[in-house]
């Protein structure tokens, strides 16, 4: 059963919008490393290179093992999923196995025939990336200004086919605040369920681009202000890791939201592995990988892993003395790692309590 991670009482500190209740899981599968665009923020630094996951591996190993690991929902990602030569065959197998299927796409590589076939499968939804709402912003940020018109046109087709679920956006220095009003107007027009916005973070290509292309706090606050009014028009506004002035932080659902890399490596959470692969990380990525799904069953490893027994979040003096300590989930460990910190330190990008001191003494350490 899907469970919302967005609640009014806490800051939306996790990069995910939803998780899974009970003992189920959600899985994202990187079916290809390749992408026709070159986005400035790409978590996995995709481009016109890299591997596709073999269809045979997906059908014979990945999907059956995820099913046995109690995965209830699947999302295909990349790279750009629609450059995979077997994308439609993969979707058909997933549908036959009874899974709800999501696809995250830049909406530049999907044909009308594919849209029709996806609609016929049923229980498929599409999320489209819009990083701004002009060719000069979205297109430039994604390495191809002409891509914007194609993305808009294809998104309309997804909507007409009943496939469109959400629009995903990374506010950045190339975007104007007013573009997010236009983006939300477009979302309402085409019947999108939600618009999810999250900052340009220090993962993948963002390690180098964040300092020059990230939207500053004032712009993020302004974007929140101009988009909030669309709630009354039925649009769900999801402001991930926007500036937070007063709320306790959300927590971490690591192990419930897993990610299969194109080479079969299984991440306990994609973002924490993306963070561990940055130059500033204090952790090896293997600390957050649960083996290789091409080689072994992954359910037992996932069941045995308990992040919160290995690490203590909020293990620092500031959190310990905070009046919100009991209610606070301590934010996102991946964000802390991506900023060069240790798990247990303060998620400074989200913490609403002013920090008058220098870096806090590290208390939590990696488990042996």
Question: What is each residue range found by the language model?
Answer:
Residues 69-75, 95-102, 123-127, 149-240:
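Conserved C-terminal portion of the radical SAM core fold
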Residues 36, 81-83, 107-112, 124, ...:
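Conserved radical SAM core fold
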Residues 217-245, 272-323:
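C-terminal accessory region of radical SAM enzymes
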Residues 2-122:
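Conserved alpha-helical substructure of the radical SAM core
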């Amino acid at each position: 059963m899907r469970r919302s991670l967005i609640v009014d009482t806490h800051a939306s500190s996790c990069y995910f919008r939803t998780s899974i209740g009970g003992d189920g899981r959600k899985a994202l599968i990187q079916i290809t490393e390749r992408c026709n665009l070159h986005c400035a923020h790409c978590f996995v630094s995709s481009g016109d290179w890299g591997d596709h996951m073999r269809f045979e591996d997906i059908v014979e190993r990945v999907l059956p093992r995820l099913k046995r690991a109690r995965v209830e929902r699947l999302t295909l990602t990349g790279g750009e999923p629609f450059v995979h030569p077997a994308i439609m065959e993969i979707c058909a197998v997933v549908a036959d196995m009874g899974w709800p299927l999501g696809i995250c796409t830049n909406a530049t590589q999907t044909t009308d025939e594919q849209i029709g076939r996806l609609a016929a499968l049923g229980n498929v939804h599409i999320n489209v990336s819009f990083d701004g709402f002009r060719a000069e912003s979205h297109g430039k940020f994604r390495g191809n200004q002409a891509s914007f018109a194609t993305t808009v046109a294809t998104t309309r087709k997804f909507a007409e086919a009943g496939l469109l679920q959400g629009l995903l956006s990374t506010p950045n220095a190339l975007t104007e605040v007013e573009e997010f009003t236009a983006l939300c107007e477009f979302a309402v027009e085409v019947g999108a369920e939600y618009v999810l916005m999250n900052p340009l973070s220090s993962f993948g290509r963002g390690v180098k681009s964040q300092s020059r292309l990230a939207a500053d706090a004032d712009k993020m606050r302004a974007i929140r202000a101009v988009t909030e009014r669309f709630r009354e028009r039925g649009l769900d506004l999801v402001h991930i890791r926007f500036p937070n002035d007063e709320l306790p932080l959300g927590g971490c659902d690591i192990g419930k939201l897993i990610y299969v890399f194109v080479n079969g490596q299984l991440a306990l959470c994609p973002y924490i592995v993306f963070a561990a692969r940055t130059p500033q990380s204090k952790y090896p990525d293997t600390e957050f990988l649960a083996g290789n799904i091409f080689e072994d069953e992954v359910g037992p490893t996932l069941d045995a892993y308990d992040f919160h027994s290995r690490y203590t979040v909020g293990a620092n003096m500031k959190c310990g003395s905070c009046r919100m300590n009991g209610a606070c989930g301590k934010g996102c460990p991946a964000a802390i790692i991506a900023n060069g910190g240790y798990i247990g330190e303060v998620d400074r990008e989200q913490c609403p309590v002013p920090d008058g001191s220098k870096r806090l003494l590290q208390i939590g350490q990696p488990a042996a």
